[in-house]
Amino acid sequence: MRLKLQSQTILTNILLPCIRHTLMKSINFVIVGDYQIASDLGKKGTTTDLSIYDRKTQDTIFTWTVPITFPDKIQSLMQATNIAEYAILNVTKIDKYLGEQVLALDAINFSEGFILHSYEVDEMKLKTLIKNTTISDFQFLDNDQLKQQMSRLKPKSREGECILPIDHAFNVKGVGTVVLGVIKQGAVKTFDRLKILPSGKDILVKSIQMHDDPVTECKSPARVGLAVKGVDAADISRGDVLCSPDSLNLKVATDAIPAGFIKSPYYKGNLTENQTYVISVGIQIKPVKIKYNNADRIEIIPEKSLVFFSGQSYALLKPDNVGTRIIAKGIIQ
């Protein structure tokens, strides 16, 4: 009897950590505006053109992604916003870059988030700026209220086939290829066989980590690190997508893609069919041309393979523009 109890205790001690990690909740934010508050919210981790801060509580892992190369690079702003489910807009001044950040959040239909502002910022002017955008219902809070509200949030989990856009990839000696990203839909388990798009290569998930802890399974919207077999980090680009091998939702396009089209009222130029633009879809940034069907319908012609699903939001960018660099938005048909 004692031996049986000891065996049960040993088994419990082995299994409980895995069970706890499997059941860990995940909530992911983007911080735009003044991102100095990030260090008060979490510990700085992965840093490239994006910095990712994280914090683990008893049952939840929080992450905050910051586009540290913005405003110099509009691309990092678009990628950071597409990684998260919730947004924090921290305003210390009203200028054209704030306008771009509002346009970025609006372009991907952000509807849940929080706004903080310094004493010098006129709240009424700020509310006027965000009027008629998807962030018009964001809550205005101070720092203490923000922390309270974040602790009450629920994860935005999506069931279905696995969709995991990759935001970082690198080789680790003795481990092999490691990819980082947020599971946008579905789940991933150790030894799952997945496909990476747009290349179509088959990969094997060797191991999984959340917040540097090993786990055997994780679900949307977990931020994870996967050790994988079947692809080298040098062959992976940011925005490549890991998915179920028999994915029905994701498509890879090299030809024209029909899409809705709304030109930004803040862009004063004309969009021409012979001009090359940059499209932001998920966390992909790819060169494209456009062809008009009518005033609110276009065809997007990618110059490189583009991964997408029907109904996905996109933003059209002109990175070298002196004014606003987010020049249009729409929904892929």
Language model: regions and residue ranges:
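Helical mechanochemical/support elements of P-loop NTPase systems and associated helical scaffolds
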Residues: 97-101, 122, 142, 184-187, ...
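Signal for well-folded cores of large energy- and translation-related assemblies
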Residues: 106, 151-154, 171, 184, ...
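Conserved, well-folded catalytic cores of nucleic-acid-processing
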Residues: 104, 108, 129-133, 169-172, ...
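Conserved C-terminal guanine-recognition region of P-loop GTPase G domains, centered on the G4
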Residues: 74-137
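C-terminal effector/interaction modules appended to NTPase cores
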Residues: 2-86, 91-92, 183-190, 194-333
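Short catalytic-site patches enriched in acidic/histidine residues
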Residues: 164-185, 208
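Canonical P-loop GTPase G-domain recognition
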Residues: 114, 118-173
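Charged, alpha-helix-enriched surfaces in structured cytosolic catalytic cores
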Residues: 36, 96, 100, 161, ...
